[in-house]
């Protein structure tokens, strides 16, 4: 089956290439950014993902920046003409001109799977999700979540870490974050249900963002099927929640599902069950994927840098010693975790979970003297500025002190985006990470089983072997 699919794809590529050679594109007088498109349709997508799987995605950018002596270059990626922006100035232009010069973009087949309705634009979809997430993460709600997060972290460590000599970190970080988000966002307390949903989400995230060809038997096809099952599970939850509302049994706090049931479409009408289910899927995957990756990466760095671990432990012990034996963390406690957050920030600089997102030019735009035609796609590359010595001196050195002052070049540190459209879940993610590491470092020390294990992107960031570690309880 795979051979037949591959043969058909190669035949299509050959015919397209012949067409491309015979009917050459008309030359343009525009001063486009330097670069090449690579193979027709595929472009340089395969090379990008090959470097990702080797754990050196930044080479894709650095090689081209060096070759063209430019921090902006064009290529063809995910089937589209695309410009990579690799500078703080490029980031600033992109983040400061949403709706004016740029709009969100995803490959069509992925966009159609992401949008809750064919009649809604991607921009409207994002705006709707930002409203819901903004309500869910308003300051009073965040204060309420801290104790719940702390109780979840303690329960997770007792169940999956205590009594084990060796654990596989990445599996457990995914399990913890997904269960936590499921409970806070959708009032899911059943472990089995959360685990089943997490398996579906993992399939979607690991197999969706590849060459988007929806053919049975391919990885993308499996991701589409997982998405359909995910969708149906959420529709069942919506029916159950509506029944709870009728019977006045709904949760006390407004979770994501409650907020989505109040959301209206652009015509002022209630959202359909299918629209709500797709929004539920998008919010949950967004809240789960990057924080779970971040936990794995932070644990990796703390294993490699024992002196950093000791300082994190010292700060967390000071906070723990100021509280009663069974007293849960408060929002004010998290404000005191300044060094721990600096460490997490430096991990997110060196290994950002998200490699960047995409925009489309709404009009012709000039950047660094180059013309970006209307309709061209743009990619802001997180790794490019995070590893730029002009933005971060000695960029390969792990240095949490970078974040003690206000010396960071604006728009260079972008693991959550920047500007008016910074990730609305940033503070929610910060709380999850701080609460988890407050509990973890006080219970355990650890060492890597595979000393030279790399972080790779396949397509998302992950430890190549799942990051097995040996645990040493702190007595």
Curated annotation (Swiss-Prot):
Which Pfam families does the record match to this protein? Answer: p450 (PF00067)
Judged by the first EC level, this protein's enzyme class is: oxidoreductase
Q: Give one GO biological process term.
A: saponin biosynthetic process
Return the InterPro entries for the record.
Cyt_P450 (IPR001128), Cyt_P450_CS (IPR017972), Cyt_P450_E_grp-I (IPR002401), Cyt_P450_sf (IPR036396)
Q: What reaction does this enzyme carry out catalytically?
A: (21S)-21-acetoxyl-apo-melianone + reduced [NADPH--hemoprotein reductase] + O2 = luvungin A + oxidized [NADPH--hemoprotein reductase] + H2O + H(+)
The pathway it acts in is: Secondary metabolite biosynthesis; terpenoid biosynthesis
Instruction: Write out the residues that bind heme.
Output: 423
Per its UniProt record, the required cofactor names are: heme
Keyword Heme listed? The answer is yes
Molecular-function GO terms, alphabetical: heme binding; iron ion binding; monooxygenase activity; oxidoreductase activity, acting on paired donors, with incorporation or reduction of molecular oxygen
**EC numbers on record:** 1.14.14.-
Q: Which UniProt keywords apply?
A: Heme, Iron, Membrane, Metal-binding, Monooxygenase, Oxidoreductase, Transmembrane, Transmembrane helix
**Subcellular localization, per the record?**
Membrane
Record's GO cellular component, any one? membrane
Which residue ranges run through the membrane? 3-23
Tissue specificity is: Expressed in flowers, maturing fruits and in juice vesicles.
In the bilayer, the protein is annotated as: Single-pass membrane protein
Q: What this chain does, per the record?
A: Monooxygenase involved in the biosynthesis of limonoids triterpene natural products such as limonin, a compound with insecticidal activity responsible for the bitter taste in citrus. Catalyzes the conversion of (21S)-21-acetoxyl-apo-melianone to luvungin A.
Family, as annotated: Belongs to the cytochrome P450 family.
Q: What is this protein called?
A: Luvungin A synthase CYP716AC1
Species of origin reads Citrus sinensis (Sweet orange)
Whichever gene encodes this chain, its name is: CYP716AC1
């Amino acid at each position: 089956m795979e051979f037949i699919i591959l043969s058909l794809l190669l035949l299509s590529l050959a015919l397209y290439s012949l067409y491309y050679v015979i009917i050459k594109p008309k030359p343009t007088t525009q001063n486009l950014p330097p670069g090449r498109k690579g193979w027709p349709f595929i472009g340089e997508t395969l090379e990008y993902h090959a470097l990702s799987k080797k754990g050196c995605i930044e080479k894709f950018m650095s090689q081209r920046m060096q070759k063209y002596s430019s921090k902006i270059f064009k290529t063809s990626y995910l089937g589209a003409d695309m410009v990579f922006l690799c500078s703080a100035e490029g980031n600033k232009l992109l983040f400061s001109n949403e709706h004016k010069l740029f709009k969100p973009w995803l490959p069509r087949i992925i966009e159609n799977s992401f949008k809750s309705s064919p009649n809604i634009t991607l921009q409207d979809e994002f705006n709707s999700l930002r409203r819901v997430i903004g309500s869910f993460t308003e300051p009073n709600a965040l204060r309420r979540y801290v104790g719940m997060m702390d109780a979840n972290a303690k329960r997770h460590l007792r169940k999956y870490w205590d009594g084990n000599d060796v654990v596989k970190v990445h599996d457990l970080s995914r399990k913890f974050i997904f269960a936590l988000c499921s409970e806070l966002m959708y009032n899911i307390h059943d472990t089995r249900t959360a685990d089943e949903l997490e398996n579906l989400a993992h399939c979607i995230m690991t197999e969706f963002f590849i060459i988007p060809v929806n053919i049975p038997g391919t990885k993308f096809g499996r991701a589409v099927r997982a998405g359909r099952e995910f969708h149906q599970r959420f529709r069942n939850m919506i029916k159950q929640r509506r029944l709870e509302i009728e019977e006045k049994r709904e949760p006390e706090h407004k979770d994501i599902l409650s907020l989505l049931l109040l959301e209206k479409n652009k015509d002022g009408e209630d959202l359909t069950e299918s629209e709500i289910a797709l929004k539920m899927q998008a919010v949950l995957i967004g809240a789960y994927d990057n924080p779970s990756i971040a936990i794995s990466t932070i644990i990796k760095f703390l294993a490699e840098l024992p002196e950093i671990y000791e300082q994190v432990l010292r700060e967390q012990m000071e906070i723990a010693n100021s509280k009663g034996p069974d007293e849960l963390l408060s929002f004010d406690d998290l404000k005191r975790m300044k060094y721990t957050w600096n460490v997490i920030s430096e991990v997110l600089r060196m290994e950002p979970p998200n490699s960047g997102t995409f925009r489309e030019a709404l009009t012709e735009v000039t950047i660094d003297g180059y013309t970006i035609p209307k309709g061209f796609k743009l990619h802001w590359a997180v790794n490019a500025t995070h590893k730029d010595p002009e933005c971060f001196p000695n960029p390969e050195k792990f240095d949490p002190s970078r974040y003690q002052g206000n010396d960071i070049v604006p728009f260079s540190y972008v693991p959550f985006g920047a500007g008016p459209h910074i990730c609305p879940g940033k503070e929610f993610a910060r709380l999850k990470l701080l609460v988890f590491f407050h509990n973890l470092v006080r219970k355990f020390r650890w060492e890597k089983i595979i000393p030279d294990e790399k972080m790779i992107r396949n397509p998302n960031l992950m430890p190549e072997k799942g990051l097995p570690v040996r645990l040493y309880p702190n007595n």
